[in-house]
Curated annotation (Swiss-Prot):
Belongs to the universal ribosomal protein uS17 family. GO terms for biological process: translation. This is Small ribosomal subunit protein uS17. One of the primary rRNA binding proteins, it binds specifically to the 5'-end of 16S ribosomal RNA. Part of the 30S ribosomal subunit. Keywords: Ribonucleoprotein, Ribosomal protein, RNA-binding, rRNA-binding. One of its GO terms (molecular function) is rRNA binding.
Length: 79
C-alpha cells in the first residue's frame, strides 16, 4: 500500500525535531451544496529543525515515531 503524502503549512515549531502541520481539505457538502473547508493538524518529524512557522511543506506517512507522531517531513513544497 502506498504511503499518503499531504501538503500543509507549519503552524508550530516549538518542539525539538517536531513540527505541527495544518492540512486543509475541501469537499462539497451533500445537503448544503457548497464547498466546505476542513482542516486538521498533524505532528511531523523534522530531523534537522529546518522548517519554521509559515513554511509550505509536504508530509508522508511513516511508522510510529512517538505517541503522536506518525508523519515525516518529505520536502519543502513551493506553492
Amino acid at each position: 500500500m502506498p504511503k499518503r503524502i499531504l501538503q500543509g503549512v507549519v503552524v508550530s515549531d516549538k518542539s525539538d525535531k517536531t513540527v505541527v502541520v495544518k492540512v486543509e481539505r475541501r469537499y462539497s457538502h451533500p445537503l448544503l451544496k457548497k464547498t466546505v473547508r476542513q482542516s486538521k493538524k498533524y505532528k511531523a518529524h523534522d530531523e534537522n529543525n529546518q522548517f519554521k512557522i509559515g513554511d509550505q511543506i509536504s508530509i508522508q506517512e511513516s511508522k510510529p515515531i512517538s505517541k503522536d507522531k506518525r508523519w515525516i517531513v518529505v520536502k519543502d513544497s513551493v506553492a
